[in-house]
A protein has these predicted regions:
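Single conserved hydrophobic/aromatic residue that forms the stacking wall/gate
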Residues: 2-3, 7, 187, 192-196
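Glycine-rich phosphate/diphosphate-binding loops and the adjacent beta-loop-alpha structural elements
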Residues: 4, 24-27, 33-42, 188
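Solvent-exposed alpha-helices and their adjacent loops that cap or buttress functional pockets
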Residues: 29-33, 81-83, 120-122, 181-184
């Protein structure tokens, strides 16, 4: 495992030298004392960042933790990047794992947080919920991000959910809010028809 970490660090440094872009396995974006955080990877990160920017202007303590390198998974880097103030976390996976207890990223995040708490590395264990998005190429827009942050604010959030995907079989779909983003976010215009 240590050898993998050395190879990872060398590869990330080589990439930085070649491109001028420096990445870490996990990168945090948002309020430094965030209480609600979404953890995810991939192309949906940009949408989350834009919604976080708007929510920060409204005084909300939110953020997004971007997974830049999933394997080998580094619990150390995850814990360093996640604000200690966080009270609730939504882990979003773009996959469905039939027969599994939960999706892969969710399981890794839960394990990292639980072990850190058990080892005394964290004083509190945030509430962690897991969601699926983007299955069957379903759109993941600003309304989906708003729905996830709203769910994190709920007194009893769903432990498992889907967002942007209408699921009338399991009824795990989060309701999508109206677009409340300012007009300047015209490139984030929401669809006028419901997700199906």
């Amino acid at each position: 495992r240590q050898r993998q970490m050395c190879i990872r660090d060398r590869a990330m440094n080589d990439f930085s030298a070649a491109t001028g872009r420096q990445y870490q396995p996990f990168e945090y974006y948002g309020h430094p004392q965030a209480e609600r955080v979404i953890i995810l990877m991939g192309s949906a990160i940009g949408t989350c960042e834009e919604v976080v920017d708007e929510l920060l202007t409204r005084g909300e303590k939110v953020g997004v933790l971007k997974v830049r390198l999933y394997r080998p998974f580094s619990a150390k880097h995850l814990l360093q990047a996640l604000p200690g103030s966080v009270r609730s976390v939504a882990v979003l996976d773009r996959t469905k794992e039939p027969g599994a207890q939960a999706e892969p990223l969710y399981l890794d995040v839960m394990t990292a947080l639980a072990e850190a708490f058990n080892n005394g590395e964290r004083e509190t264990l945030p509430r962690v919920i897991g969601g699926r998005y983007g299955l069957s190429s379903k759109e993941f827009g600003p309304d989906c991000v708003l729905a996830v942050f709203a769910e994190l604010n709920a007194a009893k959030p769903k432990a498992r959910f889907t967002v942007g995907i209408y699921d009338d079989v399991t009824n795990l779909s989060l309701p999508l809010p109206e677009n409340t983003l300012p007009v300047s976010y015209t490139h984030l215009t929401l669809p006028t028809t419901p997700y199906v």
